[in-house]
UniProtKB/Swiss-Prot annotation:
Origin species: Arabidopsis thaliana
Name of the featured protein: Long chain acyl-CoA synthetase 8
Binding sites annotated in the UniProt record for ATP: 279-290
GO molecular function terms listed in the Swiss-Prot or TrEMBL record: ATP binding; long-chain fatty acid-CoA ligase activity
Cofactor or coenzyme needed: Mg(2+)
Keywords: Acetylation, ATP-binding, Fatty acid metabolism, Ligase, Lipid metabolism, Magnesium, Nucleotide-binding
Residue numbers carrying N-acetylmethionine: 1
């Protein structure tokens, strides 16, 4: 019999059945595999230990370390224990790669608003870059130039400038001569500025050229300043009268100092690990600022700890730098970036996006020009981003709003555990249809965001997660801990927490009996947050009494800082900050009000730009001062037919006060606040609270005592 070449098993009917069953089976497998993997991975994530208990010395408490750090880290790699050593090694390793970028200045103009106020608008071009090698050469030249202009290496240098490339260069240059740098916020008022410079006996002051006028007015009060080095700025003219009025102080430009150093090189004098690198003045909420002494070892150890938990950075990453470098959060972020070989593009909060206040209409904001992959933010900025996006969505209305709301709910379900969305199918769809345009607000390429400076609300965290498509690493730390305490990991989907301890330190909870927070509390231990390890700083400059009050060294030699914050540990070892000792007030009838907790809850109202809740022990209710969101309140007034000529007039109208208070009550109830925690009366304030006004810090946290002092009459009337 002739072979037909056909296998009886390959009959058309059976082949068709097998094909159908194969497709069905394949489909079932395709569905089941992600489901099963999702279940497994979700279980793994929920059960993953991010922090583990450890026995340490010192006061009794409940202590955690990072789960992947049995030993505390202190350096990112061998031989890099100080700032100049770390920077030089990075520059040699990445010599030809981009390091510092600054936008080209094209022109500026002033526009006049309807109320007569003038506003500066800038037209900025693309970024121009300097490589690691080029920046290192400038740093060495500046270091030599400092010595050549007569600065004694045993004296201190202060930097009083906005965040910019020259700030970074001057900072690194000082370290090559073992010079301690005093950092001062560019927004600091005259009294605090004079105090900071005289207290630390600064010899050389580095400033923006626009600060010369302020300095010329106070130069007679500066007891130890001998040299002023100003940073030239495009579009800012230096008045000869400002230079000539400095008396015996020598005034030079930074370019002159660099040229002098280039011609007359000086051998470096490198510091030790325990040498004081920085005296950083806190932007605290009470009294004159305190100078925190940060060592080279502190700066390097915190950077090493962060690098262990941040998704791998490399030369392909670009960081947008716009927060104040005088704040330890921004300073440490830039140290992490240059240690990783990434690029730093400088901007400002006033030119950050296409719609920022100082951006000329029709031109690009910093993030549009830079397209960063990494950025830092403080909660107040992210709250404004959220508010802006929601406002745009509301204005579009109709199908656009319906689509956004539906997409947001689907992505929210995915982040909270929907396997279908979590595996990227829905994510790709909604990103393409809805969220791509929203991401363009921050340049469209953000892959990781670091948030610190204050607690970020869970709603804002989820919103940024979904709309920007990037994980958020929320950190907790203080100037006194060199920004390093805890940091949430990129794969942790939880909100409202600040992660496990960084690998460079420990976090301990100590019972606070008076407040009712104990480490024996169930289901989670609670207490005052105490940070120990390599990131804990040396103490306060010229203030041993205060240093002894909050810094302790245990029998094993570990240094601890008592933060005054209250926290609790979750079962996976992550910290949640729940209170602050100073912010808890006992009302007349015995109820305790946590002011910070209430402010965080009420801040979710669409009408709130800023808020301070006030409680008086001799009264049975609390009150609030509210700076309303101008856009939101004016939109309501237009729709409600409430007429007004000025925003200040609108803030005085009873209808507006009632509308805002109802919104606050709704937000408070949604956050499950008790009735006594809700403000019984409020006052609307039309002027925003800014660092320049002295009512908020550079990280935009409220300065409670200053606000109470400025508005004491308004607060008294609320209790009348």
């Amino acid at each position: 019999m002739e072979d037909s070449g056909v296998n009886p098993m390959d009959s058309p009917s059976k082949g068709s059945d097998f094909g159908v069953y194969g497709i069905i089976g394949g489909g079932i497998v395709a569905l089941l595999v992600p489901v099963l993997l999702s279940v497994v991975l979700n279980g793994t994530k929920k059960g993953k230990k991010r922090g583990v208990p450890i026995k340490v010395g010192g006061e009794e408490g409940y202590t955690m370390r990072h789960a992947r750090a049995p030993e505390l880290v202190d350096v990112p790699w061998e031989g890099a224990a100080t700032m100049p050593a770390l920077f030089e090694q990075s520059c040699k390793k990445y010599s030809k790669d981009r390091l510092l970028g600054t936008r080209e200045f094209i022109d500026k103009e002033f526009i006049t608003a309807s109320d007569g106020r003038k506003f500066e608008k800038l037209h900025l071009g693309e970024y121009k870059w300097q490589s690691y090698g080029e920046v290192f050469e400038r740093v060495c030249n500046f270091a030599s130039g400092l010595v050549n202009v007569g600065h004694n290496v045993d004296d201190r240098v202060a930097i009083f400038s906005d965040t910019r490339a020259e700030w970074f260069i001057a900072f690194q240059g000082c370290f090559r001569q073992s010079i301690t740098v005093v950092t001062i916020y560019a927004s600091l008022g005259e009294e605090a500025l004079i105090y900071s410079l005289n207290e630390t006996r600064v010899s050389t002051l580095i400033c923006d050229s626009k600060q010369l006028k302020k300095l010329s007015a106070i130069q007679s009060s500066l007891k130890t300043v001998k040299n002023i080095i100003y940073i030239e700025e495009d579009g800012v003219d230096v008045a000869s009268s400002d230079v000539n009025s400095m008396g015996d102080i020598t005034v030079s430009s930074i370019s002159e100092v660099e040229k002098l150093g280039q011609k007359n090189a000086v051998q470096p004098i490198l510091p030790s690990k325990n040498g004081v690198a920085v005296i950083m003045f806190t932007s605290g909420s009470t009294g004159l600022p305190k100078g925190v002494m940060i060592t080279h070892g502190n700066l390097v150890a915190t950077a090493a700890g962060v690098m262990k938990v941040v998704p791998k950075l490399d030369k392909n990453d670009t960081y947008i730098a716009y927060l104040p470098l005088a704040h330890v959060f921004e300073l440490e972020a830039e140290i992490v970036v240059f240690t990783s070989g990434s690029a730093i593009g400088y901007g400002s909060a006033m030119t950050l996006t296409d719609t920022s206040n100082k951006v000329k209409k029709g031109t690009k904001g910093d993030v549009s020009a830079l397209k960063p992959t990494i950025m830092t933010a403080v909660p107040a900025i992210l709250d404004r981003v959220r508010e802006g996006v929601l406002k745009k969505v509301e204005e579009k209305g109709g199908m656009a709003k319906t689509l956004f709301d539906f997409a947001y709910k689907r992505r929210l379900a995915a982040v909270d555990g929907s396997w279908f969305g979590a595996w990227g199918l829905e994510k790709m769809l909604w990103d393409a249809l809805v969220f791509k345009k929203i991401r363009a607000v921050l340049g469209g390429h953000i892959r990781f965001m670091l948030v610190g400076g204050a607690p970020l609300s869970p709603d804002s965290q989820r919103f940024i997660n979904i709309c920007m498509g990037s994980p958020i690493g929320q950190g907790y730390g203080l100037t006194e801990t060199c920004a390093g305490a805890t940091f949430s990991e990129w794969d942790d989907p939880a909100v409202g927490r600040v992660g496990p301890p960084l690998p460079c330190g420990y976090v301990k909870l100590v019972s606070w009996e008076e407040g009712g927070y104990r480490i024996s509390d169930k289901p989670m231990p609670r207490g005052e947050i105490v940070v120990g390890g390599n990131s804990v700083t040396a103490g306060y400059f010229n203030n041993q009494e205060k240093t002894d009050e909050v810094y302790k060294v245990d029998e094993k030699g570990t240094r601890w800082f008592y933060t005054g914050d209250i926290g609790r540990f979750h079962p996976d070892g992550c910290l949640e900050v729940i209170d602050r000792k100073k912010d808890i007030v006992k009302l007349q009838h015995g109820e305790y009000v946590s002011l910070g907790k209430v402010e965080a809850a009420l801040g979710s109202s669409n009408y709130v730009d800023n808020i301070m809740v006030h409680a008086d022990p001799i009264n049975s209710y609390c009150v609030a001062l509210v700076v309303p969101s101008r856009g939101a309140l004016e939109k309501w007034a237009e729709e409600a037919g409430v007429k007004h000529s000025e925003f200040a007039e609108l803030c005085e109208k009873g209808e507006a006060v009632k509308e805002v208070q109802q919104s606050l009550t709704k937000a408070g109830k949604a956050a499950k606040l008790e009735k006594f925690e809700l403000p019984a009366k409020i006052k609307l304030l039309s002027e925003p609270w800014t660092p320049e006004s002295g009512l908020v810090t550079a990280a935009l946290k409220i300065k409670r005592e200053q606000i109470k002092s400025k508005f004491k009459d308004e607060l008294s009337k609320l209790y009348a």
